[in-house]
Design a protein with these regions (language model features):
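Short helix-loop capping/hinge motifs at secondary-structure junctions, enriched
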Residues: 133-139, 158, 171-179, 258-266
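Short beta-strand->loop
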Residues: 36-38, 130-132, 150-177, 192-195, ...
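N-terminal segment of the mature folded domain
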Residues: 29-158, 302
């Protein structure tokens, strides 16, 4: 995705997880804030940062520089825990924000209740990206374990999107087997035997599939799949929407301990609140996320989203239970995944 300048913000993309600095002259900025985000929000925040910087200067007479950092959500959370002084985080799942809160004490336990919709201004889901013509005939989750199918996906240990992938696959298998958890486990174990490359984040997985040409199918965020079509054209790829997926709810949160130390609370709070504004919700939908308030978005942007059955994290007991059961050290993912040799 390009590095062309935007109003108020010019983004320079570096290695995944490294800072992307947005400014038109840092020396001119009254305030600088850092948004630590996950892989799939790059184009979203490129435009949103520009819109917010323009509004902030118009409303206050002050300029603001917005820095962004992107990478696998779990890795990003670890960077903040290890001392990266984020003003806000916009991560892939609440378990990563909870991990920061527990490890640092810089976010209050009630952080989810401070913004609407449990602090999720947008949602997404998991879909399949296949090559043009769908040569392997992939229509649903059951097709992914057929002989010869090669899957590209990110790693649940480092990527939030990968954890949503895992749970969506589990939900389908559980439903297909009348709620049988053992059968669901068996299916997901078989699915991961078909994973050719397990990248650290969604961005890396997309690159492996789209640019390097590996694999028959990519398990990916819905917005990433649409971006691939936008950037590379529908002549190369197709989106397959499975019969069941999951409602992915990426949350946003203020890092109270950091903003109070840096004196940036006012601008950081305004930044997160602006995601819920009519402008913010339009930008969210434009970049293929499902806005919390779809009535504020352009109707043509909403119309492109497929109607599908989506389970929620509540069906797994919430993120705390899902993280413990599936993704923590010694959890089900560790038990079933055997890296290719």
């Amino acid at each position: 995705m390009g590095t062309d300048g935007l109003v108020g913000v010019v983004t320079r993309a570096f290695v995944v997880g490294i800072l992307e600095l947005g400014s038109i002259g840092v020396a001119l900025a009254d305030t600088t804030i850092l948004n630590v985000s996950y892989d799939s929000t790059r184009t979203l925040y490129k435009e949103f940062n520009a819109a917010f910087a323009e509004k902030w200067e118009r409303d206050t007479g002050e300029t603001v520089t917005i820095q962004t950092s992107h990478g696998g959500s779990g890795k990003q959370a670890r960077l903040v825990i290890d001392g990266l002084e984020a003003d806000v985080v916009t991560l892939a799942l609440e378990a990563d924000v909870d991990a920061i809160a527990a490890a640092t004490g810089k976010i209050p336990a009630n952080w989810k209740s401070r913004l609407p919709n449990n602090s999720a201004p947008y949602t997404s889901t998991i879909v399949f990206l296949v090559r043009k013509g769908n040569p392997k005939g992939i229509r649903d989750w059951g097709d992914l374990t057929k002989e010869g199918i090669q899957i590209i996906a990110p790693n649940p240990k480092t990527s939030g999107g990968a954890r949503w992938n895992f749970l969506a696959a589990w939900a389908w298998a559980r439903a297909a087997n009348n709620g049988d958890e053992a059968k669901a486990r068996e299916y997901v174990a078989q699915l991961f035997k078909h994973v050719l490359v397990l990248d650290t984040g969604a961005w890396g997985a997309m690159t492996t599939f789209v640019q390097r040409g590996f694999g028959d199918v990519l398990l990916t965020w819905e917005n990433e799949a649409y971006l691939a079509l936008e950037e590379l054209g529908p002549r190369n790829f197709e989106i397959v929407t499975p019969s069941i997926s999951i409602k992915a709810e990426p949350p946003v949160a203020l890092i109270d301990g950091n903003v109070d130390n840096k004196g940036t609370r006012k601008v950081a709070e305004a930044y997160l609140n602006y995601l819920y504004s009519d402008v913010g919700q339009k930008i969210v939908a434009k970049h293929y996320y499902r806005p919390y308030r779809p009535e504020l978005a352009d109707p043509q942007d909403i119309a492109r989203f497929a109607d599908l059955k989506m389970v929620t994290i509540d069906e797994f007991g919430g993120w705390q239970e899902a993280q413990r059961k599936f993704f923590d050290t010694g959890g089900i993912f560790d038990e079933i995944y055997m890296p290719r040799r």
